[in-house]
Amino acid sequence: MRCKDCTRYDSGRTCHLNECVCLEERIEAGVVELNTLARECFGGRMFRPLQRRLRDELNRQPFRFFLGDAHRERWTHWKNRCYGMSERNAAALFLLTADEGLWQRVLWHFDSSGFDFPAIRLSGIHPELYSIYQAAKTISVGGDNIVIEDLAFSELVSDRAFRLILGALLLCRHGEVVLNLERKTEEAT
């Protein structure tokens, strides 16, 4: 990222830090846009179809982290109950609380230390929820259940799931401060 107000800014060069130490302040000041941060989330790993899909999704409508109030309330409630949860698990929780039906399958198989994925029964769930579940599992414990390249194809990952996964990746990478971007976007409109 380039941030002229940062003490680590060196004219014309990108910041050498892996994480912006001023992100919270930059969000509060309104100098970081959610769409820009979303594009940077994938870094140099984006191939053309994913670049195209990301551009189309971000231009279609304003980005929203949560599907609605019920999703926000579920995530907030369980995140607060599991104090000390890692950013990875908080991002996985974000995905798994998006749908009430999926959440009911997961509810008894997690705590602040993580998820017991092998114990979760998925038979009969909608394919869209399966991709959300696999993304949550990948974010939480690693692996290649779903890979960056899969996100480029709407046949594999629906638009709704794509937006949720993007939100989870931002949450995992930058922490809860990115949720303030949604509020800033809403205030601007």
Where do the language-model regions lie?
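Extended, charge-biased low-complexity segments
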Residues: M1-H126, K137, V141-T189
